[in-house]
Amino acid sequence: MSNLKEIKRKIKSVHNTQKTTNAMKLVSTAKLRKAEEAAKKSKVFAQKIDEVLSEIAFKINQYEGLDDKLPFFRKKDNIEKMDIIFVTADKGLCGGFNIKTIKAVNEMLEDCKTKKIKVRLRAIGKTGIEYFNFQNIEILEKYLDTSSSPDYDKACAIIQKAVDDFVNGVTDKIVIIHNGYKNMISQEIRINELLPVEAIVSKEEQKSESLMDLEPEDEEILNDLLKTYFEYNMYFSLVDSLAAEHSARMQAMDNATNNAKARVKQLNLAYNKARQESITTELIEIISGVESMK
């Protein structure tokens, strides 16, 4: 009888866990739709800015080198200092979501160590901060409650400090790493080499003439657009990471719910078997007692 009570207690416990994981799955599904929409919109806007930047950069570069006009285009032959901005979740229960990002950061740290590049980390998200603190790896800047609730102002504040350091020569390169949303069931690591700007001009190299007519202060226009470009790239990394996080958590909770269902089924079979054995034992004892009284 005590065995039956123990199995019944386990069934109740696993069933409660199943209800919890299923509820978390539904919450993540609802949040995913909102985060996915925000990621799509920010990506489209960033792409449009990229197109305009390509056009303006090409026009300016026809007359003078961009390296001399804007610090964002200055590229050193030998990179000595680099800043890595990486995004992880503030919460857990999302499968290998955070592990993939941390692995990508570690791989880049190892590569920089081999090349003797000094790296500074700017960490967004509690999970990544706790991991590198545990590893005794110094973190230059730590941002909590940002990856779980990203907004444009937060993104601007984060990237502005890094960009200022690049302009002032404190760092030679800025890279953003995050685990991005691919679809409902998968995510992918995205590494964005934000500074120095290299890709913008090359996209327009094939054009024979610019379609845009600018005022004399075209460098100022490009400078302002570049700042917006950096800000939206940072913002996209935050919202894209959040969408991927909800996707990973939804998948993890779905797997946990299915595992709980399977466990309840196993425990029910064990309960029925134990109950049948208990009844059989009782019947044998009754029959034996009756036989002994004859």
From Swiss-Prot:
This is ATP synthase gamma chain. It comes from the Bacteria. Produces ATP from ADP in the presence of a proton gradient across the membrane. The gamma chain is believed to be important in regulating ATPase activity and the flow of protons through the CF(0) complex. GO terms for molecular function: ATP binding; proton-transporting ATP synthase activity, rotational mechanism. It is found in: Cell inner membrane. Keywords: ATP synthesis, Cell inner membrane, Cell membrane, CF(1), Hydrogen ion transport, Ion transport, Membrane, Transport. InterPro entries: ATP_synth_F1_ATPase_gsu, ATP_synth_F1_gsu. Belongs to the ATPase gamma chain family. GO terms for cellular component: plasma membrane; proton-transporting ATP synthase complex. It is a peripheral membrane protein. The gene is atpG. F-type ATPases have 2 components, CF(1) - the catalytic core - and CF(0) - the membrane proton channel. CF(1) has five subunits: alpha(3), beta(3), gamma(1), delta(1), epsilon(1). CF(0) has three main subunits: a, b and c. GO terms for biological process: proton motive force-driven plasma membrane ATP synthesis. Pfam families: ATP-synt (PF00231).
